[in-house]
Amino acid sequence: MNEDPLFLACTRPAMFAGVTMEAMAFNVMATSILFILTSGFTMIGLGIGLHFVLREITKHDHNQFRVLFAWLNTRGKQKNLNRWGGGSTSPLRLIRTYEELNR
């Protein structure tokens, strides 16, 4: 299998200082809320520390936060996930293999 070096560059999300924009938005919101609640400038240091943690998370896979948000938008919002046993809210039985279709 040949790897195309341009493929990753074309699909890479927008980043700020090594962190995706989704993670940066989370960092800014969390740091701002903590700064407002505590009125202390030490929370800015906590935000910088959180930035380095988020940078280590996105170092190996830059789409990890997009996958997390996609999961939250699909399966994370379902209230009856345990009842149906999956991501679908349909009460119909899911046919999983081709052999089950021929029965």
Swiss-Prot record:
Q: What sections of the protein cross the membrane?
A: 33-53
List the GO terms this entry assigns under cellular component, sorted alphabetically: cell outer membrane
What InterPro entries does the record tag this protein with? T4SS_VirB3/TrbD/AvhB
Name the gene.
virB3
Lipid metabolism found in the keyword field: no
* Membrane topology per record: Single-pass membrane protein
Function statement: The type IV secretion system VirB/VirD4 is a major virulence determinant for subversion of human endothelial cell (HEC) function. VirB-dependent changes of HEC include massive cytoskeletal rearrangements, a pro-inflammatory activation by nuclear factor NF-kappa-B, inhibition of early and late events of apoptosis, leading to an increased cell survival, and, at high infection doses, a cytostatic or cytotoxic effect, which interferes with a potent VirB-independent mitogenic activity. These changes of HEC require the T4S coupling protein VirD4 and at least one of the effector proteins BepA-G.
Q: What's the protein name?
A: Type IV secretion system protein virB3
Give induction info: During the interaction with the intracellular environment of host cells.
**Keyword field contains Membrane:** yes
Q: Which family does it belong to?
A: Belongs to the virB3 family.
State the compartments where it is located.
Answer: Cell outer membrane
Note the superkingdom of the native organism. Bacteria
Checking Pfam families in the record gives: VirB3 (PF05101)
* Assembly and interaction partners: Interacts with the 17 kDa antigen protein that is encoded within the virB locus.
Q: Which UniProt keywords apply?
A: Cell outer membrane, Membrane, Transmembrane, Transmembrane helix, Transport, Virulence
